């Protein structure tokens, strides 16, 4: 989520770069009103894990072992600025997944197709006054509802996951950057046949946008995430998972209210997905 919010700052700024001198305060000054972030992403796991994409990449508790999963996810986020320092956030997402496996009895390759509403999140973002060359920001999000799968059981869970993140943002011509760290909490899930603990997440990362022209940026990012052990019925069935990712992309500012970005992320360990390709539309109202 941090990358989407950080790059969203550039919507409306890029067309002004040719004539306006930017400062740390003018760049991050927010106008009262509504912003929309629509993200379409294609994930290829290349491993046996299942993943959630929002608010951050994490491994779910489904113990089914797949050869590979190709997942197309649509995420819609609305951010309403009540005050230059205070934002409200609501985000919902759903996905289509092609889950590939080898038939145990015949040895043939096969797959399942699954359409699903995934989750609805509410959040708050508070932006502090600038300190030296940085603008501190803190965000908190809670899952209102999450629809999750354990083997063949689908079940809705309410208020079971929360995410807290602290960010330092800055600008040094021609780069807009963010450094962040956070914690993701997952409460125990009770399915019909099992009680599952997904494990909690700890992560740090950074993103930067290099302004190439008044309309185009080159976007880079890196993140290191650790997810604690998963337990089923109190028995540990995984070690701590390391999920490093690297990303590259570009943002094009259509006008002062609209921008489009393309991005690609690569995993750096066996617990990380092979690749994520994303298309994002930013809109101010």
Model regions and ranges:
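Outer-membrane pore/translocation modules
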Residues: 93-194
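Outer membrane beta-barrel transmembrane domains
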Residues: 49-51, 55-60, 103, 195-285
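Residues on the lipid-exposed face of transmembrane beta-strands in outer-membrane beta-barrel proteins
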Residues: 76-80, 122-126, 164-172, 181-183, ...
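Detector for outer-membrane/organellar transmembrane beta-barrel domains
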Residues: 32-46, 153-230
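Residues that define the transmembrane beta-barrel architecture of outer-membrane proteins
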Residues: 68-74, 111-122, 156-164, 194-204, ...
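Repeated loop/turn-to-beta-strand initiation elements of outer-membrane beta-barrel proteins
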Residues: 85-90, 131-136, 174-179, 214-220, ...
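Outer-membrane beta-barrel biogenesis signature
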Residues: 17-52
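Surface-exposed strand-loop-strand hairpins of Gram-negative outer-membrane beta-barrel proteins
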Residues: 42-73, 110
């Amino acid at each position: 989520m941090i990358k989407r919010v950080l790059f969203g700052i550039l919507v409306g700024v890029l067309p002004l770069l040719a004539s306006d001198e930017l400062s740390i305060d003018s760049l991050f000054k927010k106008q009262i009103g509504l912003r929309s972030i629509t993200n379409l992403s294609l994930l290829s796991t290349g491993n046996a894990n299942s993943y959630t994409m929002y608010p951050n990449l994490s491994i779910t508790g489904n113990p089914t072992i797949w050869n590979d999963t190709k997942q197309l996810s649509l995420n819609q986020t609305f951010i309403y600025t009540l005050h230059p320092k205070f934002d409200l956030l609501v985000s919902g997402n759903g996905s289509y997944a092609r889950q590939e496996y080898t038939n145990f009895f015949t040895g043939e390759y096969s797959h399942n197709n699954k359409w699903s509403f995934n989750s609805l999140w509410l959040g708050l973002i508070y932006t502090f006054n600038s300190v030296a060359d940085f603008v501190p920001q803190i965000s908190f999000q809670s899952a209102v509802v999450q629809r999750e799968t354990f083997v063949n059981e689908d079940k809705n869970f309410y208020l079971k996951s929360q995410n807290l993140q602290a960010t330092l943002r800055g600008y040094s011509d021609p780069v807009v950057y963010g450094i962040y760290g956070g914690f993701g909490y997952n409460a125990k899930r009770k399915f019909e046949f099992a009680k599952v603990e997904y494990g909690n997440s700890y992560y740090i990362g950074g993103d930067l946008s290099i302004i190439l022209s008044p309309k185009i940026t080159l976007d880079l990012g890196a993140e290191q995430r650790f997810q604690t052990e998963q337990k089923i019925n109190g028995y540990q069935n995984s070690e701590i998972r390391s999920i490093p990712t690297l990303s590259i992309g570009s943002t094009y500012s259509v006008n002062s209210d609209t921008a489009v970005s393309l991005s690609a992320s690569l995993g750096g360990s066996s617990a990380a997905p092979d690749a994520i390709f994303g298309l994002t539309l930013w809109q101010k109202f």
